[in-house]
Amino acid sequence: MGRIVGIDLGTTNSVIGVLEAGRPFVIANAEGSRTTPSVIGYTKESELVVGQQARRQLVLNPKNTFSNLKRYVGRSWDELEENSLNVAYTIRANNQGCVRVTCPITEREYAPEELIGSIIRKLIDDAEKYLSETIDSAVITVPAYFNDSQRQATKDAALLAGVRVERILNEPTAAALAYGFDKSSSSRVLVFDLGGGTFDISLLRISNGVFDVKATSGDTQLGGNDFDQKIVEWLANDFKKEHNIDLRRDRQSLQRLNEVAEKAKQELSGLNSTPISLPFIATGPNGPLHIETKLDRKTFESLCKDLIDRLLQPVEVALQDSGWTADDINDVVLVGGGTRMPMVQQLVKTIVPVTPSQSVNPDEVVAIGAAVQAGILTGELRDLLLNDVTPLSLGLETIGGLMKVLIPRNTPIPVRQADVFSTSEANQSSVEINVWQGERQLASDNKSLGKFRLSGIPPAPRGVPQVQVAFDIDANGMLQVSATDRTTGRKQSVSINGGSNLNEDEVNNLIEEAKDKADVDRRKRASIDQRNNALTLVAQAERRLRDVSLEFGPYGAERQQRAVEVSLRDVQDFLDSDDLAELDLAVSSLQEALFGLNRRISAEKRTDNNPIQGIKNTFGSLKDELFSDDYWDDDPWDYHPNNNRVGGGRDYGGRNLDRWDNDFYN
């Protein structure tokens, strides 16, 4: 098996890791950062930008820049909470009730998976550059409380990026792998994972390389962004009260509020108060309006009291499901930037009488764990075993709309569970299997994963036919359902992906489109890299010419300086054109000219300690001036007035300059 990377696909930031020589580490992106903002955007020229480049245009181009997309993956419009709709860009429901993101500049609507695929592609591209090899496989993490639809949608996003998902791994489990993969002692660990958009709790037993997940719980609509929104609401409400202007109705103002709120939240993790300044946030009857205020930690914590209360319930549920008490916990691992908030750390200390571990980086630990899982799959790490669980109960709808659970939550996976059902009417020739996921008693109150029909059942009285329904969950947490008529042996099975925002045809079309775009993107990148390299060389040449003039005067290495100046002008001219081939030739010529200049300067410096060498250099320079190939043919006496080489002219792209032209040295 080839190289497999580990990807933490986060709501706010994403990270990629890899295993090298048995040790996991994080790969920095092309910008040099170990985390990549999970932001995608289109510039005013309709060019796709991802990561930090996209983040920079959040305020100036809010309609075409998209963040926090993970909250929409695999979810229908009806499942979204109101706070998820408070974004500066436009989202809507399509005819099937799926979430679509509107991009005015491209005049297109995108499924969240399609945009998130661009984040995965950037992570893979940056890793390929670092590792100098092609990567097409990954372990991708998801919140432990992601349902089957959200997991399938995550796989779709990777598929659109041209990446095969070898394993879907729960984020808290990944954090536990990173924390305990090199520990030999036994312990009971609580992983408290508060990310940008989701919250997860997992309880694990770690012993001699075996990671046994006992229980998991969480909230996929609660994260650090909700704490930001508390500050946004506080600022917007005060401003509206004072000026009767609702800043949330203006996209640019809303984005500025989001950015300053995130910054204030981060600063209050280390300070007791922080200033908030937003000049020219709006315009009133008497001119521009500004926000100048201060937020202290006590006020911030009072704003977030309801969010802190929401963090408590999943912890209690996980403890109850595991059969453990808080006193049974030996270690606590904090994951996600949200756990840096003092009020969150204080909450954890009130729940579990254990000081949280400081041995892991909350922003990178999940990607490290994903890289460890990749090492397990490739066989590089052989002494580790992971036993995960399914986060939510799975079942089907029975008579009266009740939910019949076949696989309870926190069941170890992979797992297969079957039960026998019958018809509800006499002479019924088919049955419809409705698959649901959740903890409510009525099926309709849970999440519908899909349905299919088993036909060809022989006529019989009600309750006589026997239909066996089997649920299979693989190691990725993906579900397959089958139904078999025991009388005829007729069988119908389906892989559940009804919650995905994209059907199979859409996925295939987008894959082909992504391949086409990938070629175009590679050509664009190559062009940009070529121009950037040329600009770097131009700057080096200009700096070298200045240094030589200051050190040796205008006549030191005069001929070589002139050659550099000519080549330099050629490169600058072709930078303004689209002729990359000529630019490449001009760059090569400038490199040769710089080499000649540097060689001559080195020779000049040697004359300081060797006068005889200085005489040789002088006569050598005179010879070069009189008999250089730029002035004469190979035979110096073969002079002819029409010989173009006499003038030493250069020809790039049809532009001729002669050494006797006044413009030649300008």
UniProtKB/Swiss-Prot annotation:
Keywords: ATP-binding, Chaperone, Nucleotide-binding, Phosphoprotein, Stress response. The modification Phosphothreonine is found at T198. InterPro entries: ATPase_NBD, Chaperone_DnaK, Heat_shock_70_CS, HSP70_peptide-bd_sf, Hsp_70_fam. Disulfide bonds: none annotated. CDD domains: ASKHA_NBD_HSP70_DnaK-like (cd10234). One of its GO terms (molecular function) is ATP-dependent protein folding chaperone. Induction: By stress conditions e.g. heat shock. HAMAP family: DnaK. Belongs to the heat shock protein 70 family. Acts as a chaperone. This is Chaperone protein dnaK1. It comes from Prochlorococcus marinus (strain SARG / CCMP1375 / SS120).
